């Protein structure tokens, strides 16, 4: 876990541009900076003013835009606000997020110095290549997409089936906009393009939160009593054991502090993208939006 404190950004002293005062006020001139303290969208304000929740929205956006597995970015390591995030150096990002650290750092610098009020900011900024390698089962127990089961006793913890092996995502990236930073030999080696990599073409089942929820609904025999359909034809569903679902999602993301309150906040991220919708006046009830895929009966 990153401790709150003032990290020093590692910028190249030879580059005059990076030593000029930030010009984000012009780039964000049409955005309401103060809205960040009242639930505003993360891309509408400068990162310096993000709340902890908006930091997580930004991380989720990177996962979705680059089609990365949720395990690529450890959200629990970024339980910090925007001021702390902006003070972190590349080395601190790498320590917190491993190979994904360079991606996070570069995108944050782009936002800080070339701020835009746009949710499509990252699509043209990075070309991400993902490859997988087999890892020994003793290292970690993780989700097995085709055989995930839940403890029907619903005790204090809910165990997943152990997977024999898992794929660890390794990220190598090239940027269309380069920021001059001091490079160590190890960093330079990480930036060398991999010899044989394959771009990830689609997400496996359960990669993102809404898919995770969908897959529980689609497997009622394997996942009894957690979530149920209220109206299958309309995509309306209800959480029956909300904390149990939150524990499962937390285990999938290696976040032991996950609660339903945090999970429901993350679900609100999908409202704007019309993947999930509110169901007013009904507690624990949600609806799949027009952009959600794979939940309808007989849908290919």
From Swiss-Prot:
**UniProt keyword DNA-binding present:** yes
Transmembrane parts of this sequence: none
Record organism: Pan paniscus
What InterPro entries does the entry give? EHF_SAM_Pointed_dom (IPR033071), Ets_dom (IPR000418), ETS_fam (IPR046328), Pointed_dom (IPR003118), SAM/pointed_sf (IPR013761), WH-like_DNA-bd_sf (IPR036388), WH_DNA-bd_sf (IPR036390)
Task: Provide ranges: composition bias, Basic and acidic residues.
Answer: 185-195
Q: Which SMART domains match?
A: ETS (SM00413), SAM_PNT (SM00251)
Places the protein is found: Nucleus
Name of the protein in its database record? ETS homologous factor
- Pfam families to which the protein is assigned, alphabetical: Ets, SAM_PNT
Show the domain comment: The PNT domain acts as a transcriptional activator.
Q: Which GO terms describe its cellular component?
A: Golgi apparatus; nucleoplasm
